[in-house]
A protein has these predicted regions:
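Short, solvent-exposed loop/beta-turn-alpha elements that line the ligand-binding surface or hinge
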Residues: 143-156, 242-267, 317-322, 327, ...
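Sec-dependent N-terminal signal peptides of Gram-positive bacterial secreted proteins and lipoproteins
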Residues: 4-26
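C-terminal capping/gating helix-and-loop segments adjacent to ligand/active sites or protein-protein/ligand interfaces
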Residues: 346-347, 385-397, 407-463
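Extracytoplasmic/periplasmic substrate-recognition and gating elements
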Residues: 58, 64, 89-90, 194, ...
């Protein structure tokens, strides 16, 4: 990955997965809208002042996963479109066009655009893409822009930029915080019917739960891994780290001795396969996606499903009232043999907004001005009041607007130690082999040891 050519080959070939964050988006193919009006921008000492209004007419395009039809149910999306309305109302000579795609088609087009060096002025970038984009000079260095505006810098938490910092320079800013990609959503009524008063606390307990739930005719855990990222992002990132420790993850990134063939990492793969062989999951796990995995849960056919915090928005919107009333959230069960903390994967932001390195003049001023409008206390308040975690320092916000399940989630997050989500830090080609291999692992087409060897072989092909 030393050149754009190598990036091109990788990006076209790979299907990258997501953690965080646009995972509640619609599967609609695209959503092109032009934003040029909205509420007038309010002047407040609590807000960051955007760059000076460009004197000439400027047109910007934002490529994003924020589907406008989701604004009513997803506060991240609402904050995004509110920021466009606010900025264009205050800057009528600036027109912002939004090109929005759902997560998986977004990945595909972003890879193609990056390979052709045709990314628009503003776009979203995944943590694992960042180093390649920097090497290929696709993204603007934002460090000086941040450091030169002390008020703006104050609202940007470390979790907003951790995965987008290369050699001390910042190339992207997340609006949302990672929360957790590894949450256990469970129907307490079904568990009670089967004799359980609480969710499984350990993997040993989970194995017992699986046997009882199956005997009662329930799918223990609904899993949709068609897109191939759920098993990695929502399961293995935490399970693997509970055996290896989080320092191992960074040793992989920095190439300081860790290997995917290490016995502790193989233990995580082995546990995944053991759960599948016990019948913890539905047989069609590789034929349905992350949204479809919720349907058996909504229909009381499945007792549990494991996903990230983004699923809460869909639960609140799509889940039948009686099922929602019985739904609670917990961390995935502890790994009994773990000698390190029982991590939840997440914490840092998964997707960041980045600016094209090609921007200059009035277009650059406008893009920076909009970014400052989005990355603000006002946006943070909107995101938090809608029950989503935020990487930006908020002002005073109304916690009473949160649903009980959202409050339960935030309370849970106060007590868990975080590890990195693999797809946010490991190289894209390594993640691709890992994710494809997990599909095979869960249907017994490969052993844990062989999969570990395949991942390691791909890892060794790449340079630091």
């Amino acid at each position: 990955m030393k050149s754009l050519l190598r990036l091109s080959c990788l990006l076209i070939a790979l299907t990258l997965l997501v953690s965080m964050t646009a995972c509640g988006t619609s599967d609609k193919a695209s959503n092109d809208v032009s934003q040029s009006s909205g509420e007038q921008q309010a002047a407040s000492s609590a807000e960051v002042t955007p760059n000076a209004t460009p004197a000439e007419k400027v047109s910007l395009k934002i490529f994003t996963q924020q589907m406008k039809e989701n604004a009513e149910k997803d506060s991240r999306t609402k904050a995004f479109y509110d920021s466009i309305d606010k900025y264009t109302a205050a800057n009528p000579n600036v027109t912002i066009t939004v090109d929005a795609l759902a997560t998986e088609p977004y990945n595909d087009r972003a890879k193609t655009l990056a390979a052709a060096n045709e990314l628009p002025e503003i776009f979203e970038v995944l943590g694992s893409w960042n180093r390649d984009f920097v090497k290929s000079d696709l993204v603007m260095d934002l460090t000086e822009l941040i450091n030169s505006d002390s008020e703006w810098k104050k609202v940007i938490r470390p979790t907003a930029v951790n995965n987008y910092t290369v050699d001390g320079k910042i190339y992207g800013i997340c609006l949302e915080e990672g929360g957790s990609t590894t949450l256990l959503f469970y129907n307490s009524a079904i568990l009670k019917e089967c004799g359980f008063d609480q969710p499984p606390k350990t993997m040993t307990e989970l194995k017992d739960y699986v046997k009882v739930l199956k005997a009662k005719g329930y799918t223990p855990i609904s899993l949709g891994n068609k897109g191939d990222w759920v098993a990695e992002s929502c399961y293995l990132s935490a399970i693997g780290s509970r055996y290896t420790g989080n320092d191992w993850n960074w040793n992989i990134v920095n190439r300081t001795g860790a290997k995917f063939t290490d016995s502790e990492f193989v233990k995580g793969l082995s546990l995944m396969q053991e759960l599948a062989n016990l019948g913890a999951f539905n047989k069609d796990l590789n034929s349905i996606d992350y949204q479809q995995q919720r349907v058996p849960y909504y229909n009381k056919k499945a007792a549990m499903f494991i996903e990230g915090y983004w699923a809460i928005n869909s639960l609140l919107t799509d889940c039948p009232a009686d099922v929602l009333a019985a739904t609670h959230v917990a961390g995935i069960p502890d790994c009994d043999e773990s000698k390190v903390p029982n991590y939840a994967a997440g914490g840092n932001g998964g997707w960041a907004y980045a600016l094209s390195s090609k921007l200059d003049g009035a277009a650059k001023d406008a893009a920076v001005g909009w970014l400052k409008t989005l990355i603000s206390k006002e946006s943070a308040n909107t995101v938090l009041e809608g029950g989503n975690p935020c990487a930006i320092e908020p002002g005073e916000y109304d916690q009473s607007k949160m649903a009980p399940l959202q409050v339960e989630f935030f309370d849970l997050m106060k007590a868990v130690p975080f590890c990195e989500t693999y797809d946010l830090i490991f190289e894209p080609n390594v993640i691709d082999v890992m994710c494809n291999g997990l599909q095979d692992l869960l249907i017994n087409n490969v052993t844990p040891e062989k999969l570990a060897e395949k991942i390691q072989a791909e890892y060794e092909k790449t340079s630091k």
